[in-house]
From Swiss-Prot:
Part of the 50S ribosomal subunit. Forms a cluster with proteins L3 and L19. In the 70S ribosome, L14 and L19 interact and together make contacts with the 16S rRNA in bridges B5 and B8. Disulfide bonds: none annotated. One of its GO terms (biological process) is translation. Keywords: Ribonucleoprotein, Ribosomal protein, RNA-binding, rRNA-binding. GO terms for molecular function: large ribosomal subunit rRNA binding; structural constituent of ribosome. Belongs to the universal ribosomal protein uL14 family. It holds the Pfam family Ribosomal_L14. Signal peptide: none annotated. It comes from Moorella thermoacetica (strain ATCC 39073 / JCM 9320). Binds to 23S rRNA. Forms part of two intersubunit bridges in the 70S ribosome. This is Large ribosomal subunit protein uL14. SMART domains: Ribosomal_L14 (SM01374). InterPro entries: Ribosomal_uL14 (IPR000218), Ribosomal_uL14_bac-type (IPR005745), Ribosomal_uL14_CS (IPR019972), Ribosomal_uL14_sf (IPR036853).
Amino acid sequence: MIQQQTLLKVGDNTGARKLMCIRVLGGSKRRYASVGDVIIASVKEATPGGVVKKGDVVRAVVVRTKKAVKRPDGSYIRFNENAAVIINEQNNPRGTRIFGPVARELREKDFMKIISLAPEVL
């Protein structure tokens, strides 16, 4: 469950280290984002020489959450951190590598490029 002011780790190699959620996309009263939802975020920490720098406002898709996500078969999946991948307007990742596992829910939301780059899909 990601909401405004939530800090997330970045799961790609764009140069950003931490993001802060500014807005959850998908309706004016939308409060929470889960795995596969798109957010608007601000870069709070970045490494020098990266694609993005501190203070940039970016679009990102949530790939891991601490809050458990219920699957249609009744099982739950949860991770030990909140993480997101920075994307462009066409929902393609801006980085060339994805770090850490990602949830299978991204496949239903048509983030196939992220699925193919990820080392593990849970």
